[in-house]
A protein has these predicted regions:
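A conserved beta-strand element that flanks and buttresses the S-adenosyl-L-methionine
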Residues: 121
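Short catalytic micro-motifs in class I SAM-dependent methyltransferases
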Residues: 124-128
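Core SAM-dependent methyltransferase catalytic element
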Residues: 214-232
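A short, conserved alpha-helix within the catalytic core of class I
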Residues: 129-144
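C-terminal alpha-helical "lid/dimerization" subdomain adjacent to the S-adenosyl-L-methionine
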Residues: 154-215
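Class I SAM-dependent methyltransferase Rossmann-like catalytic core
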Residues: 1-41
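Class I SAM-dependent methyltransferase SAM/SAH-binding core
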Residues: 52, 57-108
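Short conserved loop adjoining the S-adenosyl-L-methionine
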Residues: 110-114
Length: 232
């Protein structure tokens, strides 16, 4: 989730991590999410598929890749994405130039929001909001659930002190350059299952066996730290 402007050091860090980790991660995520979307909906029977990307950030590369991949596979279906984050007016002018993708401030996603979506993507966002803010997280997910047929959540599992520190380090490296808030805690398996239970969601599938970085990340690339949950 993008929060604000950054200085020169942060911009340099952002460019560095883009080269050594993010392109590869984005390719893995794009393939996984696109494949699951194809499995969940009878896409070729629909003229339009609408995606909601919550906390999409300033880097538009992932949602662009997903739209492009789905569009090339299903040529008779139009894919449209609405992306919400804490964008400034200046940022919205800069990034709102991509066909079939619209970027809006998160405030536009009000309780009176009438648009309906086939899928809501919540990609590595919830832990940045702050999992200690239980009510806020619950209200956000509840709102997204009301307007979306499926929720696709990508997030992290921690298992104790060491894994918590490992994930904090990874988040610092990956997100400090964008001015994103670095979290203190992450889901564990129990807290995530309590989270979806309170929302009365059904988990259709959980993906926990994928590596999102190249081999040289060693322990940091432990697949048990990452998960994708598909909910309805």
């Amino acid at each position: 989730m993008f929060l604000g402007n950054v200085n020169t050091f942060r911009k340099s860090l952002s460019k560095f991590k883009e080269i050594i980790s993010q392109k590869y991660r984005r390719e893995i995520l794009c393939n996984l999410i696109s494949n699951e979307i194809t499995k969940l909906e009878e896409i070729d029977k629909k003229k339009i598929i609408r995606l909601l990307d919550y906390g999409s950030g300033y880097n538009t590369a992932l949602i662009k890749k997903i739209i492009k991949k789905l569009s090339s596979k299903h040529k008779n279906t139009k894919f449209i994405a609405d992306c919400y984050d804490n964008y400034s007016s200046k940022q919205l002018k800069l990034i709102n130039n991509i066909q079939n993708i619209k970027f809006m401030h998160i405030k536009n996603l009000s309780n009176k929001h009438k648009a309906r979506y086939n899928f809501c993507l919540i990609i590595d966002v919830l832990h940045h909001i702050g999992l200690e803010k239980n009510i806020k997280i619950h209200n956000i997910a509840k709102k997204l659930k009301k307007i979306s047929k499926f929720l696709i959540i990508k997030d992290h599992f921690q298992y104790g002190f060491i894994s918590n520190l490992t994930l904090i380090f990874m988040d610092f490296f990956s997100n400090y350059g964008e001015g994103t808030k670095i979290p203190k805690i992450y889901f564990n398996i129990k807290t995530f299952e309590n989270f979806i239970s309170k929302l009365k969601l059904k988990e259709i599938k959980r993906i926990t066996d994928k590596k999102y970085y190249k081999w040289f990340w060693f322990y940091l690339n432990n697949e048990k730290f990452q998960f994708i949950s598909i909910l309805k």
